[in-house]
Amino acid sequence: MSVIRPTTVEVETSLRLVAPDATALPVRASLRYDPADPYAVHVLFHAESAGGEAVSWSFARELLVTGLDEPAGIGDVRVWPWATPRGDFVALALSSPDGNALFEVPRSVLVRFLRRTYVVVARGREAEHLDVDTAVNRLLAGR
């Protein structure tokens, strides 16, 4: 009998990078959820179109879930609801030693993405999909 592995969820979207003067630039991004890493979501910012390099961030799926309705996160990744005259968005603030970035993400995109991740791994059932040996090996390898 073969075992069917859950599939990875990937969504391509456009975000807005909000500059300190409140102007915004569009940035293509890929949202990714892999059931082999059930607690995390991965975002790849395709900054190469603006002359930079692609940048990848990973953080807790639950952080996005909470940030849809209330401020969430401390430190490097913060998420909060952001209503504008153009519609409902979610603010995604990223901080690193190299700098800070504030992105405006359409709330509807995140809701659809998260719903698709729940089909693959239900909320609260992440531990059932965690391969502890692989996770420990990744930690020891520094990945």
UniProtKB/Swiss-Prot annotation:
Pfam families: SsgA. It is found in: Cell septum. Its main location: other. One of its GO terms (cellular component) is cell septum. Belongs to the SsgA family. The keyword Cell division applies. Interacts with SsgA. Interacts with FtsZ (via N-terminus). InterPro entries: SsgB (IPR006776), SsgB_sf (IPR038658). The keyword Cell cycle applies. Gene3D superfamilies: Sporulation-specific cell division protein SsgB. One of its GO terms (biological process) is sporulation resulting in formation of a cellular spore. Involved in sporulation-specific cell division. Required for early stages of sporulation. Important in the process of growth cessation prior to sporulation-specific cell division. Recruits cell division protein FtsZ to the future septum sites and tethers the contractile ring structure (Z ring) to the cytoplasmic membrane during sporulation. Stimulates polymerization and filament length of FtsZ in vitro. Keywords: Cell cycle, Cell division, Septation, Sporulation. This is Sporulation-specific cell division protein SsgB.
